[in-house]
Amino acid sequence: MAETTFTLWRQRLGYGIADLSCNLVWQMISLYLMFFYTDVMGLPAYYVGLMFLVTRLVDGVADVLMGLVIDNTATRWGRCRPYLLIGAIPFGLLCILAFYVPDFGTTGKLIYAFVTYLCLSFLYTLVNIPFCAMLPFLTNDSRERTTLSAVRILLGSLGATIVAVATLPLVGALGKGNQEHGFFYTAVVFGVIATFFLLVSFRNIKENISITQERMTLKRAWVSLRANRPWFVFAINIFLMWGAFFFQTGALVYFFHYYVGNNDLTAIVAGSSTFVPLLGTLTVPLLASRMKKRHVYLVASAINLRSEERRVGKE
């Protein structure tokens, strides 16, 4: 019994730290990369914004293609698990390179930033999409799936909170007043940890369930999705939600740096913005057991909209 419990928790923690790894890099991108480009690397804000828009659009296509790759993958390690091993080292390396300032002119820096950011986004897709798709292959037990998801949420939120709270203090400590060096060394810390944890995750999880399905082509997938109106409505909603998320997180550092004039508040607010949603996430299963999921979503959206309205009104 003890061995079974040990094996279960080994997989649970192995599954969860993969999300922790992804969030170490994801939070660095969403919270600090734009600020790094404009205020540390010295790139024009217009071109940085355009670069982020283009990369996000390309990344959306890459997500769909990665799903098709997973559907057509068959190895001795399973369908999803191999990509944690394949992507671990390049993922951490590109995180580091994205926060490096090369000795180029403005045009050279723009090209360097675009290439490294685009490659980092591809590598995030390479490890994160398979990780997100992995759960059905780990177990058939619905309770164990719930436990795995809970551990993932907890550790993923921990990773996001660590980056939100620790990044700017690390930049100051490691850079000793030089933001260029500080961001680079901080990226080295998070990149190395992310790579290590992805390798540990690969080592400690196993795809125990074999799901047989017909191979899917891009054309067949598009025909199927085109006929699915609820999917299109939900996809538009997700697009708008993530657009708002990137706008808020990208502006957070600028807001406290230029408008409030207190950089220390950035870590506090960014940390709370990753921890507080965790409480909401943990209440969803309880609410979903008492209400229709659609109603839960509508109520939560209404609360969020009202909160944003009040916040913007005060500002």
Functional labels for PLM-detected ranges:
Residues A2-K314:
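Membrane-embedded alpha-helical bundles of multi-pass transporters/translocases
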